[in-house]
């Protein structure tokens, strides 16, 4: 929004041209989202406490989690607010990719909001009925996938980028929609499953978003895209603003979510952040890279799938003491901060590994 104002004022004062630079707007988007989160955080916590919107705890979980009961949840509202305001202020709103991300962010956030609200009002961890939850997540993902395909049809924007192979970029055609659907829905649920300890999900999200900011910039820059042998997609450069807004909002939320947490993001935050990371991965054509950089999310999801499969196929036998896998380590006796920090370290290493693969082609 402010890009248009800066372009107008540039006619009268050249100094306003600085706001047209992508790097300047990206940094300002980060700090805007960060400061907004820090500003509204205490207000959100107080309001949630007044409304008695507290976290419900599973009875079969680690005993250490019982003390978390009643901690304000649905803090993802402040993350979405900070990202939304920052993006609307600093991104070029004529860019369709920005709107796809905002649509998924708030669409998935709305589904998560209903899920959280039902958990709170019904005083259990069941939430929204699974079939309806996945129905609405699927509708939002498919609308986005069809829209993205319509814009990028038969261009480099619908090619499949395979790590390590610079000449392997097949045109996906309609399969682009199928891939986009599974990436968006899958990532949304993966981040949701990871969000089980204080700060566990938000920091890997920040790492991945920061990496995608660099990738979006390179993909939207014709010289760098040629240098890295990745498709040049002109609309992706504005996703840098969206990614840095995620980083800022995420760090602001972590201020209140670090152990012991004063606030949980809830499904309204985890589903929204996961869904939008999946959307960004599709838009910059780096779905495989998301699997690498978001390895913590992948492992958490696989641990649940394997646990459920083992329980059903092996007459109640479990692979892990509890799934997702972060609870397994808690039940082994690891203190919660140790689990969190080690998962952060692994996440950072995987993000760096993912970035390195861009050059190893």
Curated annotation (Swiss-Prot):
GO cellular component: plasma membrane
Protein's cellular compartments: Cell inner membrane
Positions of transmembrane segments: 21-41, 74-94, 97-117, 132-152, 168-188, 199-219, 239-259, 264-284, 288-308, 339-359
CDD domains cross-referenced by the UniProt entry: GT_MraY (cd06852)
Needed co-factor(s): Mg(2+)
Keywords linked to the UniProt accession: Cell cycle, Cell division, Cell inner membrane, Cell membrane, Cell shape, Cell wall biogenesis/degradation, Magnesium, Membrane, Metal-binding, Peptidoglycan synthesis, Transferase, Transmembrane, Transmembrane helix
Mode of membrane association: Multi-pass membrane protein
Reaction(s) catalysed by this chain's protein: UDP-N-acetyl-alpha-D-muramoyl-L-alanyl-gamma-D-glutamyl-meso-2,6-diaminopimeloyl-D-alanyl-D-alanine + di-trans,octa-cis-undecaprenyl phosphate = di-trans,octa-cis-undecaprenyl diphospho-N-acetyl-alpha-D-muramoyl-L-alanyl-D-glutamyl-meso-2,6-diaminopimeloyl-D-alanyl-D-alanine + UMP
A single MF term (Gene Ontology): UDP-N-acetylmuramoyl-L-alanyl-D-glutamyl-meso-2,6-diaminopimelyl-D-alanyl-D-alanine:undecaprenyl-phosphate transferase activity
PROSITE patterns associated with the record: MRAY_1 (PS01347), MRAY_2 (PS01348)
Pathway per the UniProt entry: Cell wall biogenesis; peptidoglycan biosynthesis
Source domain of life: Bacteria
Enzyme class: transferase
One biological process term in Gene Ontology: peptidoglycan biosynthetic process
Entry-linked InterPro entries: Glycosyl_transferase_4 (IPR000715), PNAcMuramoyl-5peptid_Trfase (IPR003524), PNAcMuramoyl-5peptid_Trfase_CS (IPR018480)
Membership in a protein family: Belongs to the glycosyltransferase 4 family. MraY subfamily.
Biological role: Catalyzes the initial step of the lipid cycle reactions in the biosynthesis of the cell wall peptidoglycan: transfers peptidoglycan precursor phospho-MurNAc-pentapeptide from UDP-MurNAc-pentapeptide onto the lipid carrier undecaprenyl phosphate, yielding undecaprenyl-pyrophosphoryl-MurNAc-pentapeptide, known as lipid I.
Protein name in UniProt: Phospho-N-acetylmuramoyl-pentapeptide-transferase
The encoding gene: mraY
């Amino acid at each position: 929004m402010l890009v248009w104002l800066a372009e107008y004022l540039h006619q009268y004062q050249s100094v306003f041209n600085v706001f047209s630079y992508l790097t300047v707007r990206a940094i300002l988007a980060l700090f805007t989202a960060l400061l907004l989160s820090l500003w509204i955080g205490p207000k959100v916590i107080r309001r949630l406490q007044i409304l008695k919107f507290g976290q419900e705890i599973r009875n079969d979980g680690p005993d250490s989690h019982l003390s978390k009961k009643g901690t304000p949840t649905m803090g993802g509202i402040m993350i979405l607010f900070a990202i939304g305001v920052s993006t609307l202020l600093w991104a070029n709103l004529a860019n369709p990719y920005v709107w796809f991300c905002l649509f998924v962010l708030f669409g998935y956030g709305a589904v998560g909001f209903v899920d959280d609200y039902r958990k709170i009002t019904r005083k259990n961890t069941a939430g929204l009925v699974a079939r309806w939850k996945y129905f609405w997540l699927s509708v939002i993902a498919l609308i986005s996938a069809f829209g993205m395909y319509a814009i990028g049809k038969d261009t480099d924007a619908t090619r499949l980028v395979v790590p390590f192979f610079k000449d392997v970029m097949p045109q996906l055609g309609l399969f682009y929609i199928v891939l986009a659907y599974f990436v968006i829905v899958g990532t949304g649920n993966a981040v949701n499953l990871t969000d089980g300890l204080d700060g566990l999900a938000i920091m890997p999200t920040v790492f991945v978003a920061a990496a995608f900011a660099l990738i979006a910039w390179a993909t939207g820059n014709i010289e760098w895209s040629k240098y890295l042998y990745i498709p040049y997609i002109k609309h992706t450069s504005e996703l840098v603003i969206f990614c840095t807004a995620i980083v800022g909002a995420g760090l602001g939320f972590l201020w209140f979510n670090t152990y012991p947490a004063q606030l949980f993001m809830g499904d309204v935050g985890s589903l929204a952040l996961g869904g939008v990371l999946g959307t960004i991965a599709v838009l910059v054509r780096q779905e495989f890279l998301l699997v690498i950089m978001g390895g913590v999310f992948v492992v958490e999801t696989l641990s649940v799938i394997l646990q459920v499969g083992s329980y059903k196929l092996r007459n109640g036998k479990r692979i892990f003491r509890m799934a997702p896998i972060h609870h397994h380590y808690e039940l082994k006796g690891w203190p919660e901060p140790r689990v969190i920090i080690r998962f952060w370290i692994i996440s950072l290493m995987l993000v760096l590994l993912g970035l390195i693969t861009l050059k190893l082609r």
